[in-house]
Amino acid sequence: MSLKLPQAPNSGLFKQGYSSFSNADGAIIRNVEAVREIASILLTSMGPSGRNKIIVNKLGKKFITNDAATMLNELEIVHPVVKILIQASKQQEFEMGDNTNLVIILAGEFLNVAEKLLTLGLNVSEIIQGFNLANKFVMKTLDELVVEKVESFETDLLKAVKPVIAAKQYGVEDTIAKLVVDAVALVMKNGSFNVDNIRVVKVMGASLSQSQVVKGMVFPREPEGTVKNADQIQSCRVYQPHRYFHHRNQRYSCSSTMPRKCLISPRAKNNSWTSCARKSTIQGLRWLLPGSSVGELALHYLNKYGILVLRVPSKFDLRRICQVCGATPLPRLGAPTPDEMGEIDIIETKEIGGDRVTIFRQDESSSRTATIVVRGATQNNLDDIERAIDDGVNSIKGLIKDNRLLPGAGAVEIELMKRITAYQSTPGLLQLAIKSFAKAFEVIPRVLAETSGHDSSEILSKLHAAHAEDTGLRAGIDIDSGEVADTAVLDILATKKSAIDLAVDATNTILSIDQIIMAKRAGGPVMPQQPRPGNWDQDD
């Protein structure tokens, strides 16, 4: 009798190198464990007192941040189920710009309670059905928990932006929120604006209190060439091509039998630059913004005719400056027409903190671009402030869609937990899934209490007692004193709805996966970064 060795599942079906994990092998439990791992990484980074993480990417660049979106972008995650959750958080970042951490944490907690229900014997379809019913009830309940509205964007916008920024930069949220609101007020037109019209320029030195908002654009570089006197040029015309006056240094050679022909090429080239610069000056050109480097010969004639050159390598910045001054980007070589040139009110070159910056200031109402000049002591601090500003600007985009506000600081989660638990309209085993769904919301106030250094069990008991009363809707966690009171912290309804909905969708998608089939990774073997010990080619 011959001996038969056991083969891998589906070994005769797929090509060599495939791996398969089915539900019989515990695929769902493994998926939950993978999601729990990524959720535990981001869990302690939530809230105003959230901890920072040090992440070193594959290029060796270090990130010190508590921003979930930044961490997920820099982490190289290969697990296919966790990637589903990351896609949901990126969708939240794209649509609302905030609460990306909430999507991961809620989905991880939903899967934790679902794992317990699976061990009790509930079917996956029953858990998904119960979660969907509870999610529909939550969407209706959130509309009933609205406490305030942003009626006027000039006066009420600050109270909605402060909590968003405080989650990233606690203690300086007043200063940053004022910068964000001022910048949005400059670019908003008829109740709407484009988030790309608000730029952030980081300048090392000084403190955050010296940051300012400029109507127009600020470039962290000084002009090229010798023409640098750019202080307050009124009503100047700006010509903005992508490539203009760019000429590589070329070497010319000739034999002794052709001396006259040898002089034609450089002389013709000089005449071309002279003609272009002279005609541009006649048309009124005072400023030139090329999208690439400028050759030495072209820069010589531009300096000769008093044309100031500022190189803008970013094509996105070129498009924005076109919107500010009304210029047309041109790829051709030659003098621009009056219709192709733009106008600007004030152009000035200033020194901020030892760095030379060029400011395009447009005081007219037609300009829809604003720049926040951020000051700080370290580069890491400036990066964190920039992320907080981005979250604040994107949160205003969510307020434009829906101006209703919810109580924050863990108040709305405890209230949802109370109302979902009292939801008794569904009989049978689905009631277990609905109550477990409600229990998952308790993770938010627990994390807020733990990261702020307080006893989470004591605070949770006080929260439940406060929300048991009819007047306790706005009772939240005061992270400074550790008490439960009306903290005046507000959350945006549209952002909260989107985060919960995406977390539930991602949870149901992960629970419905009963098998994972993975192909062999393409490419050859990865070469070692360092020589192995004992290698004959290694220097002793």
Swiss-Prot record:
SUPFAM superfamilies: GroEL apical domain-like (SSF52029), GroEL equatorial domain-like (SSF48592), GroEL-intermediate domain like (SSF54849). It is found in: Cytoplasm. Keywords: ATP-binding, Chaperone, Cytoplasm, Nucleotide-binding. One of its GO terms (molecular function) is ATP-dependent protein folding chaperone. Its main location: cytoplasm. InterPro entries: Chap_CCT_theta, Chaperone_TCP-1, Chaperonin_TCP-1_CS, Cpn60/GroEL/TCP-1, GroEL-like_apical_dom_sf, GROEL-like_equatorial_sf, TCP-1-like_intermed_sf. It comes from the Eukaryota. Coiled coil: none annotated. One of its GO terms (biological process) is chaperone mediated protein folding independent of cofactor. Pfam families: Cpn60_TCP1. Signal peptide: none annotated. GO terms for cellular component: chaperonin-containing T-complex. PANTHER family: CHAPERONIN. Molecular chaperone; assists the folding of proteins upon ATP hydrolysis. Known to play a role, in vitro, in the folding of actin and tubulin. In yeast may play a role in mitotic spindle formation. Belongs to the TCP-1 chaperonin family. Heterooligomeric complex of about 850 to 900 kDa that forms two stacked rings, 12 to 16 nm in diameter. This is T-complex protein 1 subunit theta.
